[in-house]
Swiss-Prot record:
The keyword Ligase applies. It catalyses: tRNA(Ile) + L-isoleucine + ATP = L-isoleucyl-tRNA(Ile) + AMP + diphosphate. It holds the Pfam family Anticodon_1. It comes from Sulfurimonas denitrificans (strain ATCC 33889 / DSM 1251) (Thiomicrospira denitrificans (strain ATCC 33889 / DSM 1251)). GO terms for molecular function: aminoacyl-tRNA deacylase activity; ATP binding; isoleucine-tRNA ligase activity; tRNA binding; zinc ion binding. It comes from the Bacteria. PANTHER family: ISOLEUCINE--TRNA LIGASE, MITOCHONDRIAL (PTHR42765:SF1), SOLEUCYL-TRNA SYNTHETASE (PTHR42765). L-isoleucyl-5'-AMP binds at E569. The keyword Nucleotide-binding applies. GO terms for biological process: isoleucyl-tRNA aminoacylation. Belongs to the class-I aminoacyl-tRNA synthetase family. IleS type 1 subfamily. This is Isoleucine--tRNA ligase. Keywords: Aminoacyl-tRNA synthetase, ATP-binding, Cytoplasm, Ligase, Metal-binding, Nucleotide-binding, Protein biosynthesis, Zinc.
């Protein structure tokens, strides 16, 4: 007789294959239709809040795998907090101003020259259209990743109200007394003709001259030092093109300097290394303290101009000569020491990186007309030649040098009139400097990982004043009026408020398209003719750095609370968004804009190499979605250690897909097993094995939830996978098959196991829902009503872990016994003595086994019997805590229905199966 139809085999309509590629877009469309984000807000009304403030991606180009990593990670974090019962806010945003968009518009127009023929207002119109196009494109690409956010109300930095709030933040910084305008050397991109902030600087290798130049001491200086022979300070530089602008030579105030027998002056500590490298030769003729040189003069060998000798703490004696060429127009340290000694700031380089008329007017270079309009980098060789024998040594070398992040051309330091936020001034209302406020707030902030704290602290501690002005077209203008007669900038509050109101109504384009009469507050006290507009625009990092004000503090968005609970970005944002946001919030609010900062690494290929089209190792999100679906990408994010760089490749994605398949099939078998469950068995009536798995699940799920709450997803996923593979699938689902398939439908043992599985499904479902949201939502449709409880979708659930089940099950003892049993079983199978464990029985005097329900003990080992009778034919034995377990073949016949060896003969069913069949 075929007993298959009498078995309660698992059944469910939940598919083995997710068909993610086709099903995900359909499910997301249904979420859109149901306005799931709004539903999430309603479901957690009055609950504890959680605000993730989105760092805005740039509205230029399609999203790449780094964008996908970032947005998925944010989405997982937000959803974890949601399913933990919190009221979450996740308002996505876009950075819309700045150089990259301008460059794209230039390309469309056919180059810079054609762009320069257009009015600024027209250029800005084209930039605005370009950014708007990619906001829409990227929004759809992010939604395809399963990200749920306030997509209908994103923040876009070029929106009129947003631009007005960026401007208001600028005005607030000015009111705090931190905004200054001054001529100061800044990173300058001659290719893009604009100043850059530190965050816009990248370092690449560059070949440069290494040149040692002798500056003769003036006769007066030699007389004061009692030197009767040739004497020249030797400076070392890698930028010969800055020698025309030299006005000083800096020495270390704590060092001794020597005059060599060959007539050169260098730091005493460096003489031996200079001699060894054959840059100099000679012995010590005289020794001096640095202080003796202060304010004496040397002569520039290029143009004969005097160069004042000054003392500066910035001078190091680890390499070079200890005598530092100082050109205040071309370096931050040079500028600072120049302020102390009132050195002239000479700036002979124009915005394109070419020498201007200053070299002719001030006689900075012999035959200056030959250099006029010539690019500085093309002038080095000729300048070296002009200095003749004063060049002591010259060579070439490669070193790391600052480059423009967009054009990848080498930058220069160039003194120009710019707007700065002073980080070492005290904002009005504070007794601390802006830098000190920021450093103090860094200490109060949570960091994930903790190493981020020192990284941000170091950057805050060492950064110079923030240059916030740019000489470009597309950005929020530094919309101040300047009085023509005096140069004074109008910072009257009513004037500033009026300008902000105009921007809110017409956008910041109004600064360029509207006449001064319409932009000026009527009671300003000046006529339009008496004023001129400041034409610089704001650094785009100011835009994004002020989003805490425009998004969290304004009433324009339902975006959560200030301070945000978390900022999440790549590790490069310590020098970017984390820092710019900190300084602006510290300036205006005197505190950080965030309570926590999470940083992740970058995406690399499986060899750890950076992705590039030339290498052919780029993994595009679109490609992954077409081949696997977003759930596989989301599982990859959650299973990767984001603290370092994240490897991704076809083979890694295949492994992620395999892990997804295992997880899905674990849910499928449990759903199939609980398909006919109508009531949950109370804990006190559950079997020992069911209590055991519930306690194991509770312990693991607690650990997973704790890891997820600390944003340690890789650890949480590891705990979860180990539990699913080992305890859940490896043991429990296997040992309950007999009861679930062969017992009567409503048998207490069967419904107990079903109840345990149902509770695990429900808790596990909300645990993985933040990561595999599509799958979790699909599973809800196949839950028995006893745990679905009429809920519409996954978003109606809140994570609640399983309760502790009071149990006498000795886990360590039973694990040890099972492990030793299966070691022997493996040998028996290899020797073909048995095919499966149901052919076996165990004979033991173990008290712990005797205390267990006999059937539960049999199920634990998946054997046909456990007894205390005499051993008939021993196949193997093992010992646990002094108790002997003997394995032997079952003597009863195999039941044709359940396959246990408990029947009287092979034609009859066992007692249990007979009862079920007769019922």
């Amino acid at each position: 007789m075929d007993y298959k139809d009498t078995l309660l085999l698992p059944t469910t309509k939940f598919e083995m294959r997710g068909n993610l590629i086709n099903n995900e877009p359909i499910r997301y469309a249904s979420w859109d239709e149901k306005k799931i984000y709004e539903k999430m807000k309603k479901n957690r009304k009055n609950a504890q809040s959680f605000t993730l403030h989105d760092g805005p991606p740039y509205a230029n180009g399609h999203t790449h795998i780094g964008h996908a990593l970032n947005k998925i990670l944010k989405d997982i974090i937000v959803k974890h907090n949601y399913f933990s019962g919190k009221s979450v806010r996740f308002t996505p945003g876009w950075d819309c101003h700045g150089l990259p968009i301008e460059q794209q518009v230039e390309k469309k127009l056919g180059g810079k020259q054609k762009k320069e023929l257009l009015e600024k207002a027209k250029i800005r119109e084209l930039c605005r259209a370009h950014a708007a196009e990619f906001v829409d494109i990227q929004r759809e690409e992010f939604k395809k990743l399963g990200v749920i956010a306030d997509w209908e109300n994103p923040y876009v930095t070029m929106d009129f109200k947003f631009e007005a709030n960026i401007y208001r933040t600028l005005c607030n910084v000015a009111k705090k007394g931190l905004l200054i305008e001054r001529s100061k050397p800044v990173f300058w991109s001659w290719a893009e003709r604009t100043a850059l902030a530190e965050a816009e600087v990248e370092y690449e290798d560059k070949e440069d001259y290494s040149i040692f130049i002798a500056f003769e001491l003036s006769d007066e200086a030699k007389a004061k030092l009692s030197i009767n022979s040739k004497a020249a300070l030797v400076i070392w530089t890698t930028t010969p093109w800055t020698i025309p602008a030299n006005t000083g030579i800096s020495l270390n105030p704590e060092e001794e300097y020597i005059l060599t027998t060959t007539g050169y002056i260098v730091a005493k500590k460096l003489l031996s290394s200079l001699n060894e490298s054959k840059i100099l030769s000679g012995d010590i003729a005289q020794t001096f303290k640095a202080k003796e040189f202060e304010n004496l003069l040397a002569l520039n060998p290029l143009n004969g101009r005097t160069s004042r000798i000054v003392l500066g703490e910035h001078v190091l004696v680890e390499n070079g000569t200890g005598c530092v060429h100082t050109a205040p127009g071309h370096g931050e340290d040079d500028y600072r020491i120049g302020l102390v000694y009132d050195l002239e700031v000479v700036m002979p380089v124009d915005e394109t990186g070419c020498y201007d008329e200053t070299i002719v007017r001030d006689g900075l270079i012999p035959n200056a007309e030959d250099f006029l309009g010539r690019h500085i980098f093309k002038s080095n060789e000729d300048l070296i030649t002009l200095m003749g024998e004063s060049v002591v040594h010259v060579s070439k070398f490669k070193h790391s040098y600052p480059h423009c992040w967009r054009s990848h051309t080498p930058l220069i330091f160039r003194a120009t009139k710019q707007w700065f936020i002073s980080v070492d001034e005290k904002p009005s209302g504070s007794d601390k400097t802006l830098r000190d406020i920021a450093l103090s707030e860094v200490e109060k902030t949570l960091f994930f990982p903790e190493t981020g704290r020192n990284r941000l602290k170091s950057m805050v501690a060492n950064r110079p004043d923030w240059c916030i002005s740019r000489q470009r077209d597309w950005g929020v203008p530094i919309a101040f009026f300047r009085v023509k007669a005096t140069g004074e900038v109008l910072l009257d509050e009513k004037v500033l408020n009026f300008t902000a109101m105009v921007f809110e109504m017409h956008g910041s384009d109004a600064w360029y398209s509207m006449p001064t009469e319409q932009l000026l507050y009527p009671g300003a006290g000046y006529s339009a003719d008496e004023l001129e507009k400041v034409t610089d625009i704001l650094d785009v990092w100011f835009d994004s750095g002020s989003t805490w004000y425009s998004v969290l503090k304004s009433r324009n968005y339902d975006a959560g609370e200030f301070q945000a609970d978390l900022y999440v970005e790549g590790s490069d944002q310590h020098r970017g968004w984390f820092q710019s946001s900190m300084f602006l919030s510290a300036a205006v609010e005197h505190k950080a804009p965030y309570k926590g900062v999470l940083t992740h690494g970058f995406t690399v290929d499986e060899k750890g190499e950076k992705m590039s089209k030339s290498k052919g190792n780029v993994v595009a999100p679109e490609t992954v979605l077409k081949e696997y679906g977003s759930e596989i990408l989301r599982l990859w994010v959650a299973s990767s250690d984001y603290q370092g760089d994240l490897k991704i490749s076809q083979s890694i994605l295949k492994q992620s897909a395999e892990n997804y398949r295992k997880l899905r099939n674990t849910f499928r078998i449990m759903l199939a097993n609980i398909n006919d469950l109508h009531a949950l068995t109370p804990y006190e009536k559950m079997g020992e094995l069911d209590k055991w798995i519930l306690n194991e699940a509770k312990s693991v799920f607690d650990g997973v939830h704790k890891s997820f709450s600390n944003y340690n997803f890789v650890n949480g996923m590891s705990l979860l996978n180990n539990f699913i593979v080992n305890e859940l699938s490896g043991i429990y689902i296997d040992i309950t098959k007999d009861s679930l398939y062969c017992d009567a439908k409503d048998d207490a043992r069967r419904t107990s196991s079903q109840s345990a599985m149902a509770l695990i499904v429900k808790s596990l479902l909300t645990l993985i829902a933040p990561i595999l949201t599509y799958t979790a939502d699909e599973i809800v449709e196949y839950l028995p009503e006893v745990i679905r409880e009429s809920k519409e979708d996954i978003f109606d659930f809140v994570h609640k872990n399983i309760d502790v089940a009071e149990s006498g099950f000795n886990t360590d003892y039973m694990y040890a016994a099972r492990e030793k049993f299966y070691e022997i079983v493996d040998g028996l199978k290899k020797e073909k003595i048995i095919k499966n464990t149901l052919e076996l029985v165990i004979v033991t005097e173990s008290k712990k086994i005797a205390e267990m329900d006999k059937t539960a003990a049999e199920d634990w080992f998946v054997v046909s019997g456990i007894s205390h009778s005499e051993v008939i034919a021993e196949l193997g034995k093992f010992e646990v805590d002094g108790s002997i377990f003997v394995i032997q073949k079952a003597t009863a016949a195999k039941c044709p229905r359940c396959w246990k060896y408990q029947a009287k003969d092979e034609t009859a069913t066992c007692t249990r199966c007979s009862k079920v069949l007769n019922a």
